[in-house]
């Protein structure tokens, strides 16, 4: 669905990355007005923004005064994204200053506001910035955690602008909700698994599956947005790292099991969105397995992998929530109910698999069944929306939730 987006651009070296973010928005069919600060235009000129957006650049409260741009842009937007958000912009937004078109737009916006900070580590960690971020978040503004990496010059640390694809994914999540997520997971610790495991057969081959990790990453982002401390365990996922998570990368089912069981010990909720391989080769060939001269295929003996979800179900504390997944063919709901009982889980998310379904897509059609007998059948929708709905169900079941 096409939305009206204001893309604010702050005056930092990361301003050039906003060009890629703008491209992602426009290629998805969104209408984007770019509102750069005067300093941002010193990094990327107005003709670039106009060419990429197909819209005139809005950078001056004194241009087209009869259209009242300092009010109109914010009031008409479905989402305001500022990337990069400099230390100066954070301070102005927190204190309600309005000395240019972008800060005026932030004050008049009645839609969700998403800020992507980029600055040196010392500036991000300064008590004034910490207080400004806390103020903005308390008012419902979504402030993304900066990434860790190379900064301007030779410095490295926290303060790097998140990957444009990651900012875009978070924006999709906000648009799917229509608002900023409630902080109903604040103080909670959750574990999310994502992707698909691979079981090596020889140095070049493996047994695996087609899981992209998109649904699991959507769960992780949604949990961060709702205030949770998130441990994301990713198995062979080729997606930008979600902002604000503790990321653990694994390859095999054994590695996934070890990381998940350890992380789940003190978690309030565990979402097993990863697709572990059910089987692995009984032996690993140190050299590449060759074709035989007679054309006979080799026999590969398989052994069963540990059932991570079932182990988590046996280990889980009474107050802990476990969400498992089932990618099914045939009678999906009946198979899902049986799996829910076997795993001793609280919720199961069931989706039917087949050509052009689920794997790698941006949308999902699922049925969520609870151990209490509840059934929620969700229509096809963005995976971000699926994640938010499931988190709603989890929050409602967590002890102490109102």
Question: Could you describe each region identified by the protein language model?
Answer:
Residues 1-402:
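A cross-family phosphate/adenosyl-ligand binding-site feature
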């Amino acid at each position: 669905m096409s939305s009206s987006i204001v893309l604010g651009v702050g005056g930092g070296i990361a301003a050039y990355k906003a060009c890629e973010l703008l491209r992602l928005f426009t290629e998805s069919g969104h209408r984007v007005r770019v509102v750069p600060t005067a300093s941002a235009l010193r990094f990327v000129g107005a003709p670039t923004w106009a060419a990429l957006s197909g819209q005139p650049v809005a950078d001056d409260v004194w241009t087209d005064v009869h259209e009242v741009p300092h009010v109109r842009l914010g009031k008409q937007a479905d989402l305001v994204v500022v990337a990069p958000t400099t230390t100066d912009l954070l301070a102005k937004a927190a204190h309600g200053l309005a000395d240019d078109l972008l800060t005026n737009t932030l004050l008049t916006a009645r839609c969700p506001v998403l800020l992507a900070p980029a600055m040196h580590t010392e500036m991000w960690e300064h008590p004034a910035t910490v207080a400004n971020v806390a103020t903005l978040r308390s008012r419902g503004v979504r402030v993304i955690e900066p990434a860790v990496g190379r900064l301007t010059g030779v410095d490295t640390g926290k303060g790097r602008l998140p990957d444009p694809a990651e900012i875009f994914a978070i924006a999709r999540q906000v648009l799917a909700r229509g608002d900023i997520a409630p902080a109903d997971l604040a103080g909670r610790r959750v574990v999310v698994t994502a992707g698909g495991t691979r079981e090596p057969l020889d140095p070049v081959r493996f047994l695996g599956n087609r899981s992209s990790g998109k649904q699991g990453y959507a769960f992780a982002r949604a949990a961060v947005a709702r205030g949770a401390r998130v441990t994301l365990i990713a198995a062979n996922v080729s997606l930008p790292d979600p902002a604000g998570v503790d990321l653990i990368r694994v390859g095999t089912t054994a590695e996934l099991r070890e990381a998940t069981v350890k992380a789940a010990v003190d978690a309030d909720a565990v979402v097993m969105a990863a697709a572990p391989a059910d089987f692995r080769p009984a032996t690993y060939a140190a050299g590449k397995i060759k074709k035989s001269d007679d054309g006979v295929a080799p026999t590969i003996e398989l052994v069963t992998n540990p059932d991570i979800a079932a182990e988590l179900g046996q280990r889980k504390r009474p107050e802990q929530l476990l969400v498992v997944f089932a990618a099914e063919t045939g009678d999906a709901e009946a198979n899902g109910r049986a799996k829910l009982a076997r795993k001793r889980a609280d919720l199961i998310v069931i989706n039917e698999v087949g050509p052009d379904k689920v794997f790698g897509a941006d949308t999902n059609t699922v049925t969520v069944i609870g151990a209490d007998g509840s059934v929620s059948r969700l229509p096809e929708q963005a995976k971000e929306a699926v994640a938010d709905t499931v988190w709603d169900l989890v929050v409602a079941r967590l002890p102490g939730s109102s």
